[in-house]
Amino acid sequence: MRSPQSLRNGETPSPSPRPPRFPTPHFHSTVSLQKLKRFNLLILVFRLSTFCFSLASSVFMLTNPTWYHFDAFRYVFAANAIVAIYSLFEMAASVWEISRGNTLFPEILQVWFDFGHDQVFAYLLLSADSAATALAKTLKGGDTCAASNAFCVQSYIAIALGFAGFLFLGLSSLLSGFRVVCFLINGSRFYV
């Protein structure tokens, strides 16, 4: 066996390989990877449903004649439009996570961002739709709905779609809360 050549003229040995800049992912079995993919797809489906219902509610309220004369209906439009935009962003973040295997933001920030915003926007939708329901009930008792039945029906549809958006955002919030708990217990958003 040949001996290694000694260093000549004060050369220094080559540096040892550097550790990776990003931490290596945890080992997961094939079954756990499938569970994670299903979990992330379920979140994506809930976010897509929230987006569809909130966008539809905003469109129904926007096309409703004279909706802007009532504060509660303006609140429904604004809340559903905000939630639709937020859901669109969260869908993009979910697709990123499914395709790339990591989060858009650092993991701790992403977990708390999702949970906190899901909570805030769910309560925003619930309060807007509750206020609009009270106004719609008042208008039904008055002569507004007798004069323009289409206005009231379209308002009812927009409010119902807003409540459906709240339902799916609430389910997303439950899954986000589960991820927060997993992060607090395991130090990772994964539950396996």
From Swiss-Prot:
Ranges annotated as spanning the membrane: 41-61, 76-96, 108-128, 157-177
InterPro entries: CASP_dom
Ranges of the Extracellular topological domain: 62-75, 129-156
Location of region: Disordered: 1-23
Compositionally biased intervals (Pro residues): 14-23
Protein location: Cell membrane
Disulfide bonds: none
Ranges facing Cytoplasmic side: 1-40, 97-107, 178-192
Entry's Gene Ontology cellular component terms: plasma membrane
A Pfam family it matches: CASP_dom
Membrane topology of this protein: Multi-pass membrane protein
Keywords recorded for this protein, A-Z: Cell membrane, Membrane, Transmembrane, Transmembrane helix
Quaternary structure, from the entry: Homodimer and heterodimers.
Family per similarity comment: Belongs to the Casparian strip membrane proteins (CASP) family.
PANTHER family from the UniProt entry: CASP-LIKE PROTEIN 4A4 (PTHR33573), CASP-LIKE PROTEIN 4C1 (PTHR33573:SF56)
Name by which UniProt lists this protein: CASP-like protein 4C1
